[in-house]
């Protein structure tokens, strides 16, 4: 008699799934954490809502209205979720038939697009970016048949560059009437002039992902947004769980999106950009650094001699970076979050001491 294990009972695609390796899952015993693109210091908030005996609103009014005003869109064009990661998944659940439809994304890029699709049983198609990490529009066009959702991260994680806006327009024309194009703008606060939020009126099939995890310094809050036309938002509302935001999360998010909160965020962004330029300049002078790539974000991608040895050496010193060696076209690359000046100096000093 054959014995069926619990794992045997699981769906085949889940048994075969490689989970996303978040910075926290990868662990490490560091005191300089530069591997998750977080803001380096905590921002203080006081809870004002004490109604924890009641279920929260599905889409808290203050959060939606404040974000709509900040993003320059209408409240009915905003959906709030448990981080932008939930937004990624909601779009697949709303638009893709498992076993029939596909998503498409362009590596090297953020890893959750594929994990979300594979979890649901939706095919993943990839079209690697060109040498300058811009979109291969011909390659995308050739693979669009059967694709319902296209994910494009801009600025792109982990490479740090913006996608050419004319290429975005071409992609939106290629997909009109065929697929949803998702612009992942998790890092847009560091280059707000590049946002596509003003394009929603032109493109009914455009969706934009946003988060409070980066420039708003609230990675621990797990609060993200999808901006899209009302027809898209209404479909996402059909598949979102009934209470995506807890009362404390909604309380703090509304405060972070107040006029004072927006000013504080802008000041943080200016400080991070100053620190980023300091770190880029220093990295370019270090012998073990072969190449430093331009960045529009709060992190820097660089290519190193003996990158695995450098990564481990810094890890052993409590400086935790993000190894990008396994990503397509990123051999020898490490990603460094921009932290405080003290953290930057720790990285610079450690790299200068490397004998490779």
Swiss-Prot record:
Belongs to the class-II pyridoxal-phosphate-dependent aminotransferase family. Histidinol-phosphate aminotransferase subfamily. PANTHER family: HISTIDINOL-PHOSPHATE AMINOTRANSFERASE, HISTIDINOL-PHOSPHATE AMINOTRANSFERASE-RELATED. GO terms for biological process: L-histidine biosynthetic process. It is an enzyme of class 2 (transferase). Pfam families: Aminotran_1_2 (PF00155). Its cofactor is pyridoxal 5'-phosphate. Gene3D superfamilies: Aspartate Aminotransferase, domain 1, Type I PLP-dependent aspartate aminotransferase-like (Major domain). This is Histidinol-phosphate aminotransferase. The keyword Glycoprotein does not apply. Its EC number is 2.6.1.9. The gene is hisC. The modification N6-(pyridoxal phosphate)lysine is found at residue 214. One of its GO terms (molecular function) is pyridoxal phosphate binding. Keywords: Amino-acid biosynthesis, Aminotransferase, Histidine biosynthesis, Pyridoxal phosphate, Transferase. Pathway: Amino-acid biosynthesis; L-histidine biosynthesis; L-histidine from 5-phospho-alpha-D-ribose 1-diphosphate: step 7/9. Homodimer. It catalyses: L-histidinol phosphate + 2-oxoglutarate = 3-(imidazol-4-yl)-2-oxopropyl phosphate + L-glutamate.
